[in-house]
From Swiss-Prot:
GO terms for molecular function: aspartate-tRNA ligase activity; aspartate-tRNA(Asn) ligase activity; ATP binding; nucleic acid binding. Aspartyl-tRNA synthetase with relaxed tRNA specificity since it is able to aspartylate not only its cognate tRNA(Asp) but also tRNA(Asn). Reaction proceeds in two steps: L-aspartate is first activated by ATP to form Asp-AMP and then transferred to the acceptor end of tRNA(Asp/Asn). Belongs to the class-II aminoacyl-tRNA synthetase family. Type 1 subfamily. SUPFAM superfamilies: Class II aaRS and biotin synthetases (SSF55681), GAD domain-like (SSF55261), Nucleic acid-binding proteins (SSF50249). The gene is aspS. This is Aspartate--tRNA(Asp/Asn) ligase.
Length: 596
């Protein structure tokens, strides 16, 4: 029976006899003495097989190779002074093997090098995903899975032991509802022609749990969305889902800050300062051009629409007159850091802005003598008074580069936000070890969907409006809050609607007829007739949170068996075709074109 894990052995275990199981990470033969680095999910420890000292272990030690599965029984010994390895937590000890038993070997050439000395990160991701069971043996991936486990354990302990939450499972097979991304649909065999949907979130069920009196609910919930994938998206993902009755806006935020602080303390020994800063949606869009600001660095946007509104340069004045904006991204020392080539057509910053919908980037460079360099059309139409006001408002000093966005407000914001991120990273303004949390509040209830020519809920249609704005729901602020870490949203929630008449008004505002609302959400509306308590909640993207904590670039590196950006599993070759008999039982016929 195993007595210890490899990575747990320390000086206090010296002279103890231990039984270990694991994989051979490396094997080295030094003049007849064989050294094996034995690896399990906790780390590596050095095994010594000396034919003079422990002859019974030598033959199997000699026969072992990388990734062989072995059992080791031996005595923990102190390494000699010159042989200690400060890079390993177990580096002060080694195990002299009394017996080594090979439990299984490797019968094919390894498609991925697993050893801690190999640079596994350089292996193509497709190969890593195809042989994920080997990829997960690597030290980095094993640590990521352990971190994820520790985070979830911390969440559970805080919510259950400290805050009296109940963990309740909600259905995976439910009904399709409007709003949000496309659903994954499941045909019903026993109800031909009817379909289930896999849940995009447990939203409605957790609100019904509040009606039921389960006043503090949480769940580590699996969720599904059939949408185009990015680096931080998966078709199936995991949330920490929470809902609470009888708590105010500020009380919910306070509880969640304490939760986040506990997670970072338990998982990484990091003490966070609270309360976290708060910023309104309007302020975030104005200063950062987005609703998920990265506050680790400055470079805040400055609105100069009023200064250039009457300017002869039509790109600026025309944008303002058509209802748009002109904003500036001031970059101190930008003259030296950023050449004209990069902000003119074909340059990387120019292209980044264009990808976000902008037509280009106008610029002004402030010289050492206070004069400006820019294109003639700006210089010829900028009065001295406008120039001075522009430099004063942006705080521009000698050496500052001013980059302008002009046009529709959303395009100006998106393009300058993108350029700001690129410049901040390139100029070394971002401390990768810094953790900047910020709450974004006072979101609009609705945004306009130009394709469908209607309002739609910015978050979801169950978010409570600010009581001060009930007279005009179309322009109301929501009692919503997003928590952002280093420019990435890790969670979001709101106080909920709990009165039928308010919920019906919201449905009307987003264009749902009374019949449609009753058909799709009648069960919720009826529940609101039976004494529904005030409530609110939040959901965290567990994958994104762990990705940030592990300082990985993709959530695929913190998920055991992720899908590719084409929503496929290279390990199991899913999705795949099914037998026609199965389709017939489900009364489903495929209209997809035949594969080549």
């Amino acid at each position: 029976m195993r007595t210890h894990y490899c990575g747990d052995l320390r000086s206090e275990h010296i002279d103890q006899t231990v039984t270990l199981y694991g994989w051979v990470d490396r094997r080295r033969d030094h003049g007849g003495v064989i050294f094996i680095d034995l690896r399990d999910r906790t780390g590596i420890v050095q095994i010594v097989s000396d034919p003079q000292r422990t002859p019974d272990s030598y033959n199997d030690a000699d026969a072992s190779r990388s990734e062989y599965v072995v059992k080791i029984v031996g005595k923990v010994s102190a390494r000699q002074e010159g042989a200690k390895n400060p890079k390993l937590p177990t580096g002060e000890v080694e195990i002299y093997a009394d017996t080594i038993e090979i439990l299984n070997g490797v019968h094919k050439q390894l498609p991925i090098l697993v050893s801690s000395s190999a640079d596994g990160d350089q292996v193509k991701e497709d190969l890593r995903l195809k042989y994920r069971y080997l990829d997960l043996r690597r030290e980095t991936m094993a640590k990521n899975l352990q971190l994820r486990h520790t985070v979830v354990k911390s969440m559970r302990r805080f919510l259950e032991d400290d805050e009296n939450f109940m963990e309740v499972e909600t259905p995976i097979l439910t009904r399709s509802t409007p709003e949000g991304a496309r659903d994954y649909l499941v045909p019903s065999r026993v109800n031909p022609g009817d379909w289930y949907a896999l849940p995009q979130s447990p939203q409605l069920f957790k609100q019904l749990l509040m009606v039921a009196g389960c006043d503090r609910y949480y769940q580590i919930a699996r969720c599904f969305r059939d949408e185009d994938l990015r680096a931080d998206r998966q078709p199936e993902f995991t949330q920490l889902d929470m809902e609470m009755s009888f708590m105010s806006f500020d009380e919910i935020i306070d509880l969640n800050e304490r939760l986040i602080c506990r997670i970072f303390q338990d998982a990484q020994g990091i003490e966070l300062e609270r309360p976290f800063p708060r910023i309104t949606y309007a302020e975030s869009m104005e200063k950062y051009g987005c609703d998920r600001p990265d506050t680790r660095f400055g470079l805040e946007l400055v609105n100069v629409s009023d200064i250039v509104a009457d300017m002869g340069f039509k790109v600026f004045s025309g944008a303002v007159k058509s209802g748009g904006q002109v904003k500036v991204l001031p970059i101190p020392n930008g003259n030296d850091a950023i050449s004209n080539v990069r902000i003119k057509p074909g340059g990387d910053l120019f292209n980044a802005a264009v990808e976000m919908g902008a037509k280009g980037l106008a610029f002004i460079r402030v010289r050492e003598d206070g004069a400006i360099d820019t294109i003639g059309a700006i210089k010829d139409n900028l009065s001295d008074a406008q120039k001075q006001e522009l430099l004063s408002r942006t705080g521009a000093e000698a050496g500052t580069l001013l980059l302008f966005g002009a046009g529709a407000t959303d395009i100006v914001n998106k393009s300058l936000d993108r350029v700001r991120q690129l410049v901040g990273a390139e100029m070394g303004l971002i401390n990768e070890n810094q953790l900047n949390f910020v709450w974004v509040t006072d979101f609009p209830m609705f945004e306009y969907n130009s394709d469908e020519k209607r309002l739609e809920a910015l978050h979801h249609p169950f978010t409570a409006p600010n009581p001060e704005d009930l007279e005009d729901l179309a322009t109301a602020r929501a009692l919503a809050y997003d928590i952002v870490l280093n420019g990435i949203e890790i969670g979001g929630g709101s106080l909920r609607i709990y009165q039928r008449e308010v919920q019906e008004k919201v449905f009307q505002t987003i264009g749902l007829s009374e019949t449609e609302a009753q058909e799709k959400f009648g069960f919720l509306l009826e529940a609101f007739e039976y004494g529904t308590p005030p409530h609110g909640g939040i959901a965290y993207g567990l994958d994104r949170l762990v990705m940030l904590m592990a300082q990985e670039d993709s959530i695929r590196d913190v998920i055991a068996f992720p899908k590719t950006q084409q929503a496929s599993c290279l390990l199991t070759d899913a999705p795949a075709g099914v037998d026609q008999k199965q389709l017939k039982e489900l009364f489903v016929a495929s209209t997809a074109p035949e594969k080549d």
